[in-house]
């Protein structure tokens, strides 16, 4: 496992099988937990961000039986998440106000996406092109919006 912690940018890139990556970030104002590209079966990618104005970009490809977790606490955070694999999961949690999330899961089966947003003015856009799969979006607060598509 590699861990890079930089005040402005944190990136994690792995290729292979049975890999794990974690990017913890604390503080606010422009942390970017991004460039997370985690490929190969049985992979795990975790990004944790605390503070406001953070962004997370994560991608898992050809990653059957893999998990992708993003947790953001604070306001004005954004997450862009993609996963293309079978038997895999995405779990995104955002707490605060004015957060946004875009999640895509494609070419998979038996996969799941869970989005939880707590606070006000949050938005989520979820697209899933997968068979025998599930999407669960929970928003608690006011002025939130969500769009979900399954194909």
Swiss-Prot record:
Keywords: Fimbrium, Signal. One of its GO terms (cellular component) is pilus. It comes from the Bacteria. Residues 1-20 form the signal peptide. One of its GO terms (molecular function) is identical protein binding. InterPro entries: Curlin_rpt. It is found in: Fimbrium. Belongs to the CsgA/CsgB family. NCBIfam families: PRK10051.1. Curlin is the structural subunit of the curli fimbriae. Curli are coiled surface structures that assemble preferentially at growth temperatures below 37 degrees Celsius. Curli can bind to fibronectin. This is Major curlin subunit. It comes from Escherichia coli (strain K12).
């Amino acid at each position: 496992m590699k861990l890079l912690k930089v005040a402005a940018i944190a990136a994690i890139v792995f290729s292979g099988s049975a890999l794990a990556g974690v990017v913890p970030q604390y503080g606010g104002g422009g942390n970017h937990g991004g460039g997370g590209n985690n490929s190969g079966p049985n992979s795990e990618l975790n990004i944790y961000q605390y503070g406001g104005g953070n962004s997370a970009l994560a991608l898992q490809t050809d990653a059957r039986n893999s998990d992708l977790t993003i947790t953001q606490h604070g306001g004005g955070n954004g997450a862009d998440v993609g996963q293309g694999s079978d038997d895999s999961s995405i779990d995104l949690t955002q707490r605060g106000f004015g957060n946004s999330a875009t999640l895509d899961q494609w070419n998979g089966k038996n996969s799941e996406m869970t989005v939880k947003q707590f606070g006000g003015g949050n938005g989520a856009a979820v697209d899933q092109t997968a068979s025998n799969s599930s999407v669960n979006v929970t928003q608690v607060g006011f002025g939130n919006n969500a769009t979900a598509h399954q194909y």
